[in-house]
């Protein structure tokens, strides 16, 4: 009905409600005869159909009908309920109802409205049959359209038009006080009915399509027809809520359907059969999902909303594959579906026999039985001899064109395929079955069941039927076997590899169909899972070497190496490299670690390849058994004294591995990451790193990726989501394996534990049981580490954050007090507080933590230990590895002297026997030269000291450049005068004989500290020393050399410290040491900051 006619009827019907006579009567005296009046009612009972309105309106204008008004109301109500949702029928109904309303106004319309509204009340009893439910929904859809049309033309307006309130349906009586628009109340009642089943979604979509102006604010064409001014807004709000619920339900059903498909697929592969419970549930969910999906698309397009993704697999399962830019590129052999074009045509292009089949079935005539029997025998003879594509295709056509198709022939064909023993003809027989599969489905189904049962009997018995396996493989290539049946066979063969012949069956099956399954897109994903299962099974310790070799051959069969890869030369490993690989990764727990250290020290360290292998072995702890990580650390600690730079490189690489693990955050690398943090912990336990390095690593693990390096429960860190507890496992692995707690570690441990506790609370609660146990064990281990103060755990996030804040404030207060005492607050903070309190506190006052934690400062240690005598040399921190080796030093020296005669500089920590018989005059010259070299080594003449002297010279040149011209000239002049005085002193003493008694002695001793280079050992002064003993000048040992001919003799002179010569030497040595330390700090700071 067009808008003009609607407005015309609306005007007439509104005037009728106001009591005006608007219906045109043919005559003033109406026909009151029974025949005429009952005839009108009979016409009404026929229903409102196209063409009936003119006859009914004519009778309505001529017949009296007053006495039959109640019967007319009942008849019209029944007719309205049965109006079909057709445009012409609805228009006819609107015209007739409008005419009746204009003729009788409220007397007719008021009871009609009450009776018609009963049709929209939802049934109180559930309708069991879905068919009946759909019929009811279709009827309600037509009734709603008729009601809306009558509402727009002004016939039905509001509940106030109903005179008897008892006639109002129950669902409207509850809401009479709310004064909602009548059409809105009806729609709300209809759309809420069994929403989860989606029956009413079709009503919603049909309504918005038919009455679109009711939902558009920019369309005012029907504003004059709407009785309630709030109707538009109410309908828009109602449908907005309905759309949100529809989208959510459609997405939920989409995930359920996909999940059900995946579970069914897994169940099929596991059992090899269709499961009725999955099929029934799927068949039940699919129609509901289709209803919601269709409704969501329609509503989304109408209201211009973003429609959720409901096609194909769920978003979580989508895997995008990059398509190649070159469409005609030649794939490598292992990625080709078929070996060549002829093979592709054989399996993919089947002959079209549809016309032959239709002719055979439509014009089949009775033939002579003898002739028919001859034809059948000839057909089977030719079938037995068929060996190529053309012949088998011709036989497919002959079968139908010769009218051979009947039940007996089909059974004979099935028996023929079961009994044939010629393996070479199985591909053409499979092609025959594939060509006729559409017309003989029962033969295909029976033959597949035969192959399936035969296959099942082989899986668990000591039998093998190669013919059936090959036939099964050929049927796979023609895609006649269901995918679940294929992968059930493969999976079962892999899982029960110990059953005799299963590996042979799997080899035959994959030899004939493996590449097809691997490269066919429909099977590729499942086949890759099967290949991974084979690779995992290959690592099963229960399998013998023959089984593992067979599985390796299957993988090679599926992924054959290219000719290019076969020609590539394999990297060869030297026997020495192979020896150290086996020693560290296989035999680490079989030998004493001291022996392993000796073997590693004897490696050819000058060979770069050997160094690379050893570096890889000591920097990849995940490649050894987890229980052997402490042993690996022991060996590394044993090397520290001899290969310090190498050990530092290994530790740096472990720290880099931990950093890399945080950046990549790959689930598959979790065990690697655990191994690395355990290795770092053991390195700390063996005193090769300071506690600051370990603490910084723990903080870095916790804070990595968080905003401002601070974990916050209100901001999502994608690399560390709230439901990922792996970082907690890393931290607890470190803390639970710490075996020593130096003072510097204990000092900062409380803040670390409090911060770690806060971090655990920002995770989703409750924690998993295993994680909770590890956290509890960690806090229990450290609860008594702080002396009398016991660490108390918090109950929740708020309490933990409060305690952490209080601890930070107290530490900041102590830090500020110390800075004021030192007078350096301004230089450290620049008048501001640190932006990150935890960082500022954990990194605060490094100078105060220069103590070695009873361990080793790898970067800032003094060089004194390096240039100490060989007899007293030991690794910094005196770790266990060095102590265990001390008893074997003498035995080692003989071997090492033989190995290292040509390279003394590489002997970083080796010790030799020292000859104590210095005054033996009968020694030859070689022995004396050896003694001299040992003496030089004892007093610092090693490479490290030379390097320090060179660094001192470079630093002096650097300072010299900073001075102006006048200062440099003054220093040069002073140096020349000093050299001149020294030369004069030497010339004057050439002929002078030195007598100890003539050495001048100063009355008061000069208090000068003795340098480490010149003193061997010094016992602490006793508290019982007398004043005279304390006042005596201390003496320094000097070696006095005399040469007589070729023989050189030496003797020790004890010179007092108050002699000017001695004091000058002491001051020079002290100055040299101080400058050396300054240079070292500058260089190290520049290198490692």
Curated annotation (Swiss-Prot):
Transmembrane spans: none
GO molecular function: RNA binding
UniProt xrefs under SMART domains: MIF4G
Gene3D superfamilies: 1.25.40.180
Keywords assigned by UniProt, alphabetized: Cytoplasm
GO cellular component: cytoplasm; exon-exon junction complex
Compartmental location: Cytoplasm
SUPFAM superfamilies for the chain: ARM repeat
Protein name, as recorded: Nonsense-mediated mRNA decay protein 2
UniProt organism field: Saccharomyces cerevisiae (strain ATCC 204508 / S288c)
Lineage: Eukaryota, Fungi, Dikarya, Ascomycota, Saccharomycotina
Gene coding for it: NMD2
